[in-house]
């Protein structure tokens, strides 16, 4: 049952926020939308509505499966009301152009049959945040249900990169100009957004006390390198690196893969780890690794990769594919699949100083900019259209 936001004793009503995402706020693995939601919960009543979950999710090993027993009920977690919407099936990208009419119909039906809980939460919201992906299908619904709500689109990823269905791409092109804010994690995403005046660059943030976390070191004596996350994970990197650098211990955290038979004894593989626990492994490493399996990664990852941001924050030299080196001095690029370039990049990282070159905002400052980027001129990607000077009538002009 939905509970309307209550006014505090002061009589000033706290704002009400709603986040729509294919993530769930309660999962151990955290993305940027989780940290933004943390900040929203400090500012007002906050709800998190989780989409794209059904019986099909079992086939893909969805990370929300441990929450299945709580589906279709409101659960309070760390000050946020959470709702995991489980349907019998959910729409998906069939990757078959001849099935596009069926695919479109699936998405339209899904968006047209929301649960009452979502409708109630939309009506009560002052601000609705849509994360890139399937949440796009519900923007039009939000506009109809609550025309007064501020609509914010958080582009955590480019839609073409995460292989959303054509319906979602076309729908976003249609509704983009009507949104109040489109907040991109990288300027490189702007080219595929069919709007300009409401488009801003707001990168990821870091925990305000991140530099105070992660002590003591989890490592024994010696040289240690760390890789965190599963995105496009390339085990072959560690097959090469572990043999070429036996003096380095490589720590692989949350790759989503087991131990590769080609790994040396100096590779330690960990399963999923809570975000706070990974900080020590990053903070005390000699260098960090972003082992993406291909150069065919989106250019915006140079700015948007959470692991690279955390390496940058701690001044860690980072080894990553050439495509995501970007303008960052502390990164050393290699070509995936090319052993010589992997070895050269690691050699450079081992010799590099530990210097923080990148300015990193905390999550509070980041959330300020996501909600109201116009208050921060540096976030604007396109020049503000000039205000037309008032036109004088011909009679007024002649009188001057």
From Swiss-Prot:
GO process annotations (BP): polysaccharide biosynthetic process
By its UniProt entry, which InterPro entries does this protein fall under? GumK_N
Glycosyltransferase is among the record's keywords: yes
For the ligand (UDP-alpha-D-glucuronate), the binding residues are 230-231, 272-273, 292, 306-310
Q: Gene3D superfamilies from the entry?
A: 3.40.50.11010, Glycogen Phosphorylase B
What outcome is documented for mutating residue 157 to A/E/N in this protein? Answer: Loss of catalytic activity. Loss of xanthan production
Question: Which GO cellular component does the record give, naming just one?
Answer: plasma membrane
Chain residue ranges for the region called Disordered: 377-400
Which keywords describe this protein according to UniProt? Carbohydrate metabolism, Cell inner membrane, Cell membrane, Glycosyltransferase, Membrane, Transferase
Query: What are the subcellular locations of this protein?
Result: Cell inner membrane
Catalytic positions? 157
A GO molecular function held by the record: glucuronosyltransferase activity
Task: Give the compositionally biased regions (Polar residues).
Answer: 390-400
Residue ranges of the TM segments: none
Q: What is its EC number?
A: 2.4.1.264
Name the consequence of residue 292 to A.
14-fold decrease in catalytic efficiency. 25% of wild-type xanthan production
On the tree of life, the source organism's domain of life is Bacteria
Effect of gene knockout: Cells lacking this gene accumulate Man-alpha-1,3-Glc-beta-1,4-Glc-PP-polyisoprenyl, are unable to produce GlcA-Man-Glc(2)-PP-Pol, and show a decrease in xanthan production of more than 95%.
Reactions catalysed according to its record: alpha-D-Man-(1->3)-beta-D-Glc-(1->4)-alpha-D-Glc-1-di-trans,octa-cis-undecaprenyl diphosphate + UDP-alpha-D-glucuronate = beta-D-GlcA-(1->2)-alpha-D-Man-(1->3)-beta-D-Glc-(1->4)-alpha-D-Glc-di-trans,octa-cis-undecaprenyl diphosphate + UDP + H(+)
General function of this protein: Catalyzes the transfer of a glucuronic acid (GlcA) residue from UDP-glucuronate to mannose-alpha-1,3-glucose-beta-1,4-glucose-P-P-polyisoprenyl to form the lipid-linked tetrasaccharide GlcA-Man-Glc(2)-PP-Pol, with a glucuronic acid-beta-mannose linkage. Is involved in the biosynthesis of the exopolysaccharide xanthan, since it catalyzes the fourth glycosylation step in the assembly of the pentasaccharide-P-P-polyisoprenyl repeating unit of xanthan. Is unable to use the trisaccharide acceptor freed from the pyrophosphate lipid moiety.
Task: Tell me which family the UniProt entry assigns to this protein.
Answer: Belongs to the glycosyltransferase 70 family.
Full protein name: UDP-glucuronate:glycolipid 2-beta-glucuronosyltransferase
